[in-house]
A protein has these predicted regions:
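Elongated, mostly alpha-helical coiled-coil "stalk/stator" tethers of large membrane protein machines
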Residues: 1-115
């Protein structure tokens, strides 16, 4: 299946869920940091594609990349668990970018979050 289609489906579903929970701003910050981690550490993507790592190990890696030592938000952790259980971790960077784009369009904010 096309990377863009899959990524946008997950991003749209996440955006709807985030709005229903009132967590879109928190998720935006977490995804900005995750995007920054993907750009700063290209090996992060390779690690997530490693079949030897368990879902739990990958989830820990993703959460650390997104929030550091702080605990990840409930919505973020639930979404990442879904992505990992569905074996879509190879799409994660694209899902991340799609979500950030949807958020900015929804909030009419075109400036980038720079943590």
């Amino acid at each position: 299946m096309d990377i863009g289609i899959v990524s946008m489906r997950y991003a749209k579903a996440l955006m709807e869920y985030a709005k229903s929970m009132g967590a879109e701003d928190t998720l935006y910050k977490e995804f900005c940091m995750l995007d920054r981690s993907f750009r700063k550490h290209p090996d992060l993507r390779m690690a997530l594609e490693n079949p030897i790592l368990t879902i739990r190990e990958k989830l820990t890696l993703i959460c650390t990349a997104a929030v550091g030592d702080a605990p990840a938000g409930r919505e973020f952790a639930r979404f990442m668990t879904l992505v990992l259980k569905n074996r879509r971790e190879n799409f994660l960077q694209y899902i991340c970018l799609s979500f950030l784009d949807l958020y900015r369009k929804d909030k009419h904010s075109f400036r980038k979050y720079n943590p």
